[in-house]
């Protein structure tokens, strides 16, 4: 007997008080301990022109020196280079992957510059989807390479966004969390920088580019995120060099006219970027990647494969029903293909039989022709043989007659000689 158990509604749930300590209040601690032991992964995609300061900013953000090869402006196309690192802060381990867009914006024809980036992001989604679809999944040990944040480096022109930037961000906004930043912000005057920021945000809105929205629905981060959102795009300066300022050493850039401190919020937005990207919203970026961007890719892929939540009448459609429907569809296609192949095979066999019969007929005709030719040649040879035999017989007869005449002549000559000798005596 099968008993159907329905999902209880909220009205059926009752709040009960506990008479003693049970222990499930330790669930948050269990989750923290499990996450700490497993470690975390975070993947950053840096999109920007060559020499705009992507590597320097990454070094500054994470207070370390990552491996980086100096890039030239002679790349034939855009290629993506990913490097992974193991970082540890206190007892928290982070597997960080930094993906650089080498050669971006260096080509004369920039129409397809975004394609390698889109293909790379989709490839990481596809790899994760294939791991999910395995019968024996191993997501616990799987190295998740999906991009969690895209830092889009905008050149400090002070005017407006380049068409390449708008096209690329529009192609990426449904696939990744875009955080626009103005690179090398120390090259723009402060009053121009404010206008430049407003211009960029206006162009993004007018062109329908969806950038990452800092979450404001959680009380713990709502206030700081709401405050920081007005500073987008962040104007940043990166530097790993320390300069003495007063009695302290600070990361800064030294110029003849003065010093630009990286962590001074009056000089640039580096601290705001670090707060938003790492200290406040890193987990939300990871969650948004999985629940929004990856789910969109997964849904599209499953729909391409024929899996849907509802049937044509908008009725719920279970996975088992989808499987049966697709199985029947594939079986029908298979039978159709088999019948087509059978018909094709029969047709090919008939064509081959006709070819073989025609070839056999030609061979018989050639054989008959050769046979007649052989018989004619044989007859000619036999006739020649008879002629030769007759000639040989005639020759033998003539030879015998000649020998007889010669013998008779010799005998008569001998007799004549004997008579002559007798006369002399």
Curated annotation (Swiss-Prot):
**Quick check: keyword ATP-binding in the entry?**
no
Q: Where is the composition biased (Low complexity)?
A: 401-416
Q: Which UniProt keywords apply?
A: Cell cycle, Cell division, Cell projection, Coiled coil, Cytoplasm, Cytoskeleton, GTP-binding, Nucleotide-binding, Phosphoprotein, Synapse
Give the region (Disordered) as residue ranges.
399-425
Q: Where is this region: G3 motif?
A: 100-103
Q: Which GO terms describe its biological process?
A: cell division
Looking up InterPro entries in the UniProt record yields:
G_SEPTIN_dom, P-loop_NTPase, Septin
**Binding residues for GTP:** 48-55, 103, 184-192, 238, 253
What does the record give under GO molecular function?
GTP binding
Protein family membership? Belongs to the TRAFAC class TrmE-Era-EngA-EngB-Septin-like GTPase superfamily. Septin GTPase family.
Assembly behavior: Septins polymerize into heterooligomeric protein complexes that form filaments, and can associate with cellular membranes, actin filaments and microtubules. Forms homooligomers. GTPase activity is required for filament formation. Interacts with SEPTIN7, SEPTIN9 and SEPTIN12.
Protein's recorded name: Septin-11
Q: Which organism is it from?
A: Pongo abelii (Sumatran orangutan)
Q: Which gene encodes it?
A: SEPTIN11
């Amino acid at each position: 007997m099968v008993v159907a158990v329905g999902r209880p509604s909220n009205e059926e749930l009752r709040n009960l008080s506990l008479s003693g300590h049970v222990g499930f209040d330790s669930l948050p601690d269990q989750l923290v301990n499990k996450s700490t032991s497993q470690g975390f992964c975070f993947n950053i995609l840096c999109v920007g022109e060559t020499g705009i300061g992507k590597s320097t900013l990454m070094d500054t953000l994470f207070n370390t020196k990552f491996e980086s090869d100096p890039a030239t402006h002679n790349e034939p196309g855009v290629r993506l280079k990913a490097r992974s690192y193991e970082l540890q802060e206190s007892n928290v381990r982070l597997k960080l992957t930094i993906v650089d867009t080498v050669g971006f914006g260096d080509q004369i024809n920039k129409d397809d510059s975004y394609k390698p980036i889109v293909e790379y992001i989709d490839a990481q989604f596809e790899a994760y989807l294939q791991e999910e679809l395995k019968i024996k999944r191993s997501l616990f040990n799987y190295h998740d390479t999906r991009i969690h944040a895209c830092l889009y480096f905008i050149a400090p022109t002070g005017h407006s966004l380049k068409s390449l930037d708008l096209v690329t961000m529009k192609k990426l906004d449904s696939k990744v969390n875009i955080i626009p930043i103005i690179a090398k912000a120390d090259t723009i005057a402060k009053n121009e920088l404010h206008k430049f920021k407003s211009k960029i945000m206006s162009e993004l809105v007018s062109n329908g580019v969806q950038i990452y929205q800092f979450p404001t629905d959680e009380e713990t981060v709502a206030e700081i995120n709401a405050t920081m959102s007005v500073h987008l795009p962040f104007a940043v300066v990166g530097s790993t060099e320390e300069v003495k300022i007063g009695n302290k050493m600070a990361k800064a850039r030294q110029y003849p006219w003065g010093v630009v401190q990286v962590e001074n919020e009056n000089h640039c937005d580096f601290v705001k970027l670090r707060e938003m990207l790492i200290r406040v919203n890193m987990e939300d970026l990871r969650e948004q990647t999985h629940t929004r961007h990856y789910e969109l890719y997964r849904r599209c892929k499953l729909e391409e494969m024929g899996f849907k939540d509802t049937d044509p009448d908008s009725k719920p459609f279970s996975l088992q029903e989808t499987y049966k429907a697709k199985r029947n569809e594939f079986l029908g296609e298979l039978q159709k293909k088999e019948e087509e192949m059978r018909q094709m095979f029969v047709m090919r066999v008939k064509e081959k039989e006709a070819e073989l019969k025609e070839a056999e007929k030609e061979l018989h005709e050639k054989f008959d022709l050769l046979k007649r030719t052989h018989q004619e040649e044989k007859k000619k040879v036999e006739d020649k043989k008879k002629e030769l035999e007759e000639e040989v017989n005639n020759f033998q007869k003539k030879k015998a007659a000649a020998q007889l005449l010669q013998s008779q002549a010799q005998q008569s000559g001998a007799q004549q000689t004997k008579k002559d000798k007798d006369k002399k005596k």
